[in-house]
A protein has these predicted regions:
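Short functional linear segments
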Residues: 1-62, 69-82, 87
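Nucleotide phosphate-binding/pyrophosphate-handling subdomain across enzymes
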Residues: 196, 201-206, 213-224, 228-232, ...
Length: 497
């Protein structure tokens, strides 16, 4: 049935209105946008008819890696015949990236899915917000090109604009009355869409923390924590133990729990919480996987090319081993299907922003890692790539939010690189002149070269980085902030890269 008064302009205007009126981390500090506690979300869910009770769920928290694990797991579950909802945040270009549905392959499960080229909500071709990008499967640091992908590789649909518009119009007064945050609104939207589309299971990623996160009204079949590192300390605590405790708040009574990576400080926290909830607890880094002999092969072939994905892959395969013990997930025993689905996660799930090649010549790689733990992995991989002698120079486009641990990041940044430091549209971003000052102070104090260019916008920064191409095969990296990745990706998409 057509949505009353819907048009693309009406959709964009309504979304912008909601975004401006309700607090979100994109435009205000986390402390102002984050509403700890579940009361508002529980009330909103009741008003929506408790949609999250109409399907099974898997809950994922963690400082780093939860988006990758969520997308890999959703890809696998859909490949074995389940209709899978996937809720992640933030989005990179299109708001609707936050809520996706992955369909089973139609040729294998004709009674479970429509054609992989059809949107289950609209009957139209699935939405793609990114044009085809030149990629090479021969390189470990690049993703495969579209022509190298299986014909049914694209099986993901974004929540339709019409649905978003109707939802925001229908429940706008309730959103005001309940004094919701933007994240609570998007969580309710995703939960209801999944119910309306009759998904079998939804993979739900927390927004921030776990215990008091809006998504924590669900009782999942499996609770997963990917990793713990220092981030959002003002809200979650200043120690690894405190942050682990907040994340472990997603453990539920009698629900199995899986931890991807633990540290000496965090393992006792997880063990204590699992004991309280009566949850069987598995540490992925300690177990022998049923697909252990295929691990390295899968890692080499994955279209998620960051070397840090090794940890996430082990977490996903551990989750598969736990879930396949129950009837709903028995299809996960099909190892070839599981392997293929993981290998093609980025293409099947429409997943972007993780060691993604935005351009081939010169090679431009982008990653949304933004805290010291994530950036250490990024910078280490860049240095290994440079050590091969294949690239003439390293150019890094960098921006940072004002609340991030810049003092912890500066020592990790590659020494021999040219830096293009920039500002962002977000009011949370550290102004470029402040970033440049602190960068220079650290470099001079450490006796390191201080090759930098300062720009005011992401678009200007990308143009500057490309202008530094010496024609001898430079390597360009864009990172430090999700918002930088969003603005840079928009730049490349608008120019057809």
């Amino acid at each position: 049935m057509p949505v009353k008064n819907y048009s693309e302009k009406a959709y964009k205007d309504k979304l912008e209105s909601i975004f401006k009126r309700f607090p979100s981390v994109q435009k205000v500090p986390f402390g102002d946008a984050y509403k700890p506690g579940l009361e508002h979300m529980e009330s909103f869910a009741r008003l929506l008819g408790d949609p999250h009770l109409r399907y099974r769920t898997i809950h994922i928290a963690g400082t780093n890696g939860k988006g990758s694990v969520a997308n890999m797991l959703a890809s696998v579950l859909s490949a074995v015949g389940l209709k899978v909802g996937l809720y992640t945040s933030p989005h990179i270009i299109d708001f609707r990236e936050r809520a996706r549905i992955l369909l089973p392959p139609a040729s294998i499960y004709p009674d479970r899915a429509r054609s992989a080229v059809e949107n289950p909500a609209t009957g139209q071709a699935p939405t793609s917000i990114y044009p085809d990008r030149a990629r090479s499967a021969a390189r470990r640091d690049l993703s495969p090109s579209p022509e190298e992908l299986p014909s049914e590789s694209v099986c993901c649909s974004l929540v339709p604009q019409e649905y978003v518009y109707d939802f925001l119009c229908r429940y706008e007064k309730d959103m005001d009355d309940l004094d919701l945050s933007f994240f609570e609104i998007t969580t309710g939207l995703a939960f209801k869409w999944f119910a309306d589309e009759n998904v079998d299971v939804a993979v739900i990623e927390t927004g921030l923390g776990g215990r008091l996160d809006s998504t924590n009204i669900i009782t999942p079949d499996l609770s997963i924590i990917t990793s713990i590192a220092l981030d959002h300390c003002a809200l979650l605590g200043n120690t690894l133990e405190a942050i682990a405790s907040e994340k472990a708040g997603i453990f539920k009574k009698g629900v199995p729990a899986l931890v991807g990576e633990y540290l000496a400080e965090t393992r006792p926290v997880f063990e204590a919480k699992a004991s309280q909830t009566g949850s069987s607890l598995t540490f992925a880094q300690d177990v022998e996987l049923s697909m252990e002999e295929r691990f390295e092969s899968i890692l080499r072939e994955m279209d998620l090319r960051g070397e840090y994905q090794a940890k996430n892959l082990r977490t996903v395969l551990s989750a598969v081993d736990i879930l396949k013990r129950t009837p709903l997930y028995s299809g996960l025993s099909d190892q070839p299907t599981v392997e293929d689905a993981i290998i093609h996660t980025a293409s099947r799930a429409g997943f972007h922003g993780r060691w993604e090649a935005l351009r081939k010549d010169p090679l431009v790689i982008a990653d949304l890692g933004h805290n010291p733990a994530a950036l250490k992995e990024n910078f280490s991989q860049l240095e290994r790539m440079m050590s091969t002698g294949e690239y003439s120079s390293l150019i890094i486009v960098y921006a940072v939010m004002a609340d991030k641990d810049l003092d912890g990041i500066l020592p990790l940044m590659p020494t021999d690189a040219t830096y293009v430091l920039t500002g962002l549209e977000s009011t949370r971003a550290l102004p470029p002149e402040d970033l440049a000052r602190r960068f220079k102070e650290y470099r001079e104090g450490a006796g390191k070269p201080c090759k930098m260019v300062v720009t005011s916008s992401a678009a200007e920064a990308v143009k500057t980085a490309l202008s530094l191409d010496d024609g001898r095969n430079p390597l360009i990296f864009i990172g430090g902030s999700t918002y930088l990745l969003s603005e840079a990706s928009s730049f490349f998409v608008s120019r057809g890269f």
